[in-house]
Amino acid sequence: MSVINCEEVKRDEFHTEKYYESYNIFGAHVVTEDEIQGVRFTVWAPHAKAMSVVGDFNEWDYEQHKMLQVTEEGIWSLFIPHIEEGEIYKYAIETLAGDVILKADPYAVYAEVRPNTASVVFDIKGYEWNDKNWIRKKKKKSIYKEAMTVYELHFGSWKKKEDGTLYSYREMVEELIPYVVEHQFTHIEIMPLVEHPYDRSWGYQGTGYYAATSRFGTPHDLMHFVDECHKYGIGVILDWVPGHFCKDAHGLYLFDGTPTYEYKDKDVQENPVWGTVNFDLGKREVRNFLISNALFWMRYFHIDGFRVDAVANMLYWNKEGQEQSNEHAVSFLRELNEAVFAEDEDFLMTAEDSTAWPLVTTPTYEGGLGFNYKWNMGWMNDVLKYMECAPEYRKHIHEKMTFSLLYAYSENFILPLSHDEVVHGKKSLLNKMPGDYWDKFAQLRLLYGYFFTHPGKKLLFMGGEFGQFDEWKDLEDLDWNLHDFEMHRYMHDYFKELIALYKRSKPLWQLDHSPEGFQWIDANNNEQSIFSFIRQGDKQEDALVIVCNFTKATYENYKVGVPDFEYYNEILNSDAQQYGGSGQVNKKRLKTILEPYHNQAAHVEITIPPFGVSILRPVKTRKGSKKQDGSKTKVRSNVTSRGKR
């Protein structure tokens, strides 16, 4: 991609039209002009009286390298000869009030390691990618009808070196990728990697949207990490925050002394809880900054998806006492998604949205917001509230486990067991479970069994796979020493077997976005807190029966209605002794009894384990078998408008 000479820029392209390559104009670009090598600096500061580039190369002297204003709307530019990659710099901006403030470059692709805040000249071009096979394979698949298991992680606290220092992007190739492959996750979702000054913001309060944080290395190092992920069949999703940004003095806030990237109106500018300000999504220059940024990460870093943070905060104005939709944000999100899918129709655009806004995952040409996935926050909240309840009282909130199926197909959902639920005093997933030590592990195994068999793609935050006991401590790494304890090893073994079963079982994902992929057997047994249901794939024989018991009672010869296959095998039981359970399993092949039950043509009698999930697979169908209504069993149609773009 060539750098566009600023003098040739048509004003309308950046200021009034959709212009999604603004990173080619703005920022610091190593170029040759008039046969002289140097760096061209270009910045947008509409209310600046004067601008300079300052750095070590001119001893931070505001007078030496004054920039030229090349458009009336406030584009400033300067070519400085004979400076090279690696130079640190900032913009010195004289405000309308006569003050001189120092700002990092909004379009810088590299920055100093915190606590330093200067931008760094870096030639981002030149990385040689080796992921053609990944791209080709990705285009052959439909993400809607494939297994998807996402491992959410914080790059700085997944694992640290013995001396407490961080692993680099390149070092994480050897540490993280084999672990993800071993656990058969299809994707990793990394909490924000844009440059940010404060570690404990986790990257959600950024100052450098185009700069991969230098905490872990250079932009090319991150490209290498993504390249290696693709080599091993792992997709990379980034957490991305287009709604708000931090107020640090060197960042975007009051960039030229006046609200530039943020709203002017204080009522809608501020996020008091987060201490951030909202992007002015009604301003064309801001839209071009953000949408160009999304495409920049796609084009330069080969990212496979974004989890768009805080969509609810974007959709609604945060005026006190009001709930009014922000039409700027609505039209921005539609424009963003159209641009992203025009670039890559196989991209993952996931909305982190807790509202009931309709048609979030419906294409824009059908009136939707245009995402293709949405976190199912309602499912997460209901299920965790249910699990935290004492087992003997769960029968009184039975509907929390069934309500999600009333809307499960209204959007394309991802089920998130995310970082938000295991921090700030909320406890880890394991420690949310009531009861004694054994009970906690049994119920976490049960939760995971329900999680992997419920419709929707899957996301789990790091540490959950082996039963992290403490909640997430963002300044420390995970408690890897827990593998020294038997119950955590059992949990880890169970999780790996469960995810492997999920990936090889088409009924658990093939019709995730079609109501024909799910059928309740018994949703109403609140007295015993037992749920049973069927997951169905495209083919008749691609069916699984799932039975979940959310109390500690054991039931012998429990009747479960099933489709009329001759036999069933129990292919997973969370109470198996090899997973730390009590061993109440169904070892023998289960012969169906041809008597209707639960509105099914037949039933089986099984042992239901305490706090257990049992997954049954049909073995053999009867010739000419009929359903209860007398019609022959047939393959269900999977025609649906959901799960498509």
From Swiss-Prot:
Keywords: Carbohydrate metabolism, Glycogen biosynthesis, Glycogen metabolism, Glycosyltransferase, Transferase. Residues 636-645 have a biased composition (Polar residues). One of its GO terms (biological process) is glycogen biosynthetic process. Pathway: Glycan biosynthesis; glycogen biosynthesis. GO terms for cellular component: cytosol. InterPro entries: A-amylase/branching_C (IPR006048), Branching_enzy (IPR037439), GlgB (IPR006407), GlgB_N_E_set_prok (IPR044143), Glyco_hydro_13_cat_dom (IPR006047), Glyco_hydro_13_N (IPR004193), Glyco_hydro_b (IPR013780), Glycoside_hydrolase_SF (IPR017853). One of its GO terms (molecular function) is 1,4-alpha-glucan branching enzyme activity. Signal peptide: none annotated. It is an enzyme of class 2 (transferase). The active site is at residues 309, 352. Its EC number is 2.4.1.18. Residues 619-645 are annotated as: Disordered. Gene3D superfamilies: Glycosidases (3.20.20.80), Golgi alpha-mannosidase II (2.60.40.1180), Immunoglobulins (2.60.40.10). It catalyses: Transfers a segment of a (1->4)-alpha-D-glucan chain to a primary hydroxy group in a similar glucan chain. Belongs to the glycosyl hydrolase 13 family. GlgB subfamily. Catalyzes the formation of the alpha-1,6-glucosidic linkages in glycogen by scission of a 1,4-alpha-linked oligosaccharide from growing alpha-1,4-glucan chains and the subsequent attachment of the oligosaccharide to the alpha-1,6 position. Monomer. This is 1,4-alpha-glucan branching enzyme GlgB. It comes from Bacillus cereus (strain B4264).
